[in-house]
């Protein structure tokens, strides 16, 4: 294992040195406003430079936190994005109703592209209001638990469902199961109310529980407010419906100040990729022997089988 750790450290340190050279060059040239920071690492290095200047010390670019954050970005950023896209394609293949509704929605919100027989541009995809697309992406993250768990450290002695947890304990939270993809476990509300902080209680009220009747189903409409329901004629643009990311519990990216800071990039990537795939292709059902719902768990959850049968679609009315 020592060899692998050394290789890992050598790789990370090389990337840190590259970012350091970019940022120190930025200062010496006096063109900080014109040079674009290329990555999260550039921002980490810039923040360390600013913190060192305020403290009157030399920057320390090689200290542990920067290395640890960079490793987390490399592992989690790559695996979570590929996992999310794999599950999105799998869910849309399995659920023809959602796939058809989403394609109709994309044609409606990108009406000019549809009339002109062309693919929407990235600028159009990332800026257009598309509540049903956002709901589908959110439902993928809820159901797929691309990141199987998240960690927090207890800052004081506490209790979790009757179990004593001493200060300093690392607590592992599952991002699936009860409350997320299965009915919630009933707890003693009186005891829970006394042990929770006012902010925690307020958050619990702000994000309601899912209905136990359909919590296990892949149903993107749960993220829309008000519920779109049937309309005649159908409003595929969902003009009078809003996407609500707090419609119910979902922990794919953690929360609070230690939540995933790459969350917006993942959503942006999913918006682009899902739109482009459904714009050009029908996702046809695969044989049962190639359609297992089982997953492989690691730093992210990936489907064991993710096969596609594609048919090209026509553009324009």
From Swiss-Prot:
Pfam family, one: p450
Source domain of life: Eukaryota
Coiled-coil intervals: none
Residues binding heme: 260
Annotated function: Cytochrome P450 monooxygenase; part of the hps1-dma1 gene cluster that probably mediates the biosynthesis a derivative of cyclopiazonic acid (CPA). The hybrid polyketide synthase-nonribosomal peptide synthetase (PKS-NRPS) nps1 might incorporates acetyl-CoA, malonyl-CoA, and tryptophan (Trp) and utilizes a C-terminal redox-incompetent reductase domain to make and release the tryptophan tetramic acid, cyclo-acetoacetyl-L-tryptophan (c-AATrp), as the first intermediate in the pathway.
PANTHER family registered for this protein in UniProt: CYTOCHROME P450, P450, PUTATIVE (EUROFUNG)-RELATED
Protein name: Hps1-dma1 cluster cytochrome P450 monooxygenase cyp3.1
Source organism: Dothistroma septosporum (strain NZE10 / CBS 128990) (Red band needle blight fungus)
Organism lineage string: Eukaryota, Fungi, Dikarya, Ascomycota, Pezizomycotina
């Amino acid at each position: 294992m020592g060899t692998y750790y050394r290789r890992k450290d050598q790789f990370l340190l090389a990337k840190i040195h590259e970012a350091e050279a970019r940022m120190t060059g930025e200062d010496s040239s006096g063109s900080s406003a014109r040079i674009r920071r290329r990555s999260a690492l550039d921002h980490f290095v810039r923040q360390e430079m600013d913190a060192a200047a305020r403290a009157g010390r030399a920057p320390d670019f090689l200290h542990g936190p920067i290395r640890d954050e960079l490793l987390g970005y490399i592992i989690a950023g790559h695996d979570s994005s590929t996992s999310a896209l794999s599950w999105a394609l799998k869910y849309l293949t399995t659920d023809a109703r959602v796939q058809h509704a989403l394609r109709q929605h994309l044609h409606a919100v990108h009406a000019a592209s549809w009339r002109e027989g062309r693919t929407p541009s990235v600028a159009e995809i990332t800026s257009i209001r598309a509540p049903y697309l956002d709901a589908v992406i959110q439902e993928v993250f809820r159901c797929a638990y691309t990141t199987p768990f998240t960690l927090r450290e207890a800052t004081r002695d506490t209790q979790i469902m009757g179990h004593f947890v001493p200060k300093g304990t690392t607590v592992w939270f599952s991002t699936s199961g009860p409350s997320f993809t299965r009915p919630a476990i009933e707890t003693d509300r009186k005891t829970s109310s006394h042990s929770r902080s006012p902010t925690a209680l307020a958050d619990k009220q702000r994000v309601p529980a899912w209905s136990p009747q359909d919590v296990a189903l892949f149903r993107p409409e749960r993220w829309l407010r008000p519920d779109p329901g049937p309309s005649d004629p159908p409003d595929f643009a969902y003009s009078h419906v809003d996407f609500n990311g707090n419609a119910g519990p979902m922990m794919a990216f953690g929360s609070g100040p230690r939540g995933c800071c790459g969350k917006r990039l993942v959503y942006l990537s999913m918006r682009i990729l899902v739109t482009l795939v459904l714009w050009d292709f029908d996702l046809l059902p695969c044989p049962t022997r190639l359609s297992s719902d089982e997953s492989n768990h690691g730093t992210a959850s990936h489907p064991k089988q993710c096969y596609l049968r594609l048919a090209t679609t026509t553009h324009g009315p």
